[in-house]
UniProtKB/Swiss-Prot annotation:
Keyword Nuclease appears in the UniProt entry: yes
SUPFAM superfamilies documented for this protein: His-Me finger endonucleases
Entries under InterPro entries matching the protein: His-Me_finger_sf, HNH_nuc
Organism: Bacillus subtilis (strain 168)
Protein name from the UniProt record: SPbeta prophage-derived putative HNH homing endonuclease YosQ
GO BP term (any one): intron homing
Keyword set includes Protease: no
Length: 173
């Protein structure tokens, strides 16, 4: 088993993510974060308590130093599989696309999307206004939106799920 010295604390780390105490020559206990990642703490004499994500330590010592703003991705989606063969350094966008591809994350619809400009109720009212004949400029003024964004809603490029729900509920069978 290959192990490397960790500069942040008196430990060795293996390619599987096991942290070994240099003093006791035994594996150190780790804990699981609320987000499901394995973490280890160390109380530094001068810096105080420091916590480290195990997968980031494995990546740093067995792949290469992680550039600022980059993520360490678990290839199989298992946050506790910290083996170096299961890790890769990726951009935030690549990390999100990977999570969506393997089913760990889906695009958030409606107001739960962090980029949403409207609440579900506002979007519903806007769609009903568009159905009733309101133009993009009027709707933009009423809802404080750019007319181009209103156009995206009108043509179902935004809020499509809500459009579909409204159309299903208003059609006569």
């Amino acid at each position: 088993m290959i192990r490397k010295e960790v500069e942040e604390a008196p430990w060795w780390i293996t390619e599987t993510g096991v942290i070994i105490s240099k003093k006791l020559k035994k594996p150190r206990k780790t804990f699981i974060t609320p987000h499901g990642y394995e973490m280890i703490g160390y109380t530094h004499p001068k810096k105080g308590t420091q916590n480290y994500l195990v997968h980031r330590l494995v990546a740093k010592y067995f792949i290469y130093d992680i550039p600022k703003g980059m993520f360490v991705n678990h290839i199989d989606g298992n946050k506790l599989n910290n083996h170096v063969r299961n890790l890769e350094i990726v951009t935030p966008k690549e990390n999100t696309l990977h999570a969506m591809k393997i089913g760990l994350m889906s695009g958030q619809p409606g107001e739960s999307n962090s980029m949403s400009k409207l609440t579900n109720m506002e979007a519903t009212n806007l769609i009903y206004d568009l159905i009733a004949g309101m133009n993009n400029v009027e709707a933009g003024e009423k809802y404080s939106l750019h007319p181009r964004y209103v156009s995206l809603i009108r043509h179902k490029r935004r809020w499509k799920t809500l459009w579909d729900r409204i159309e299903r509920s208003t059609t006569i069978a």
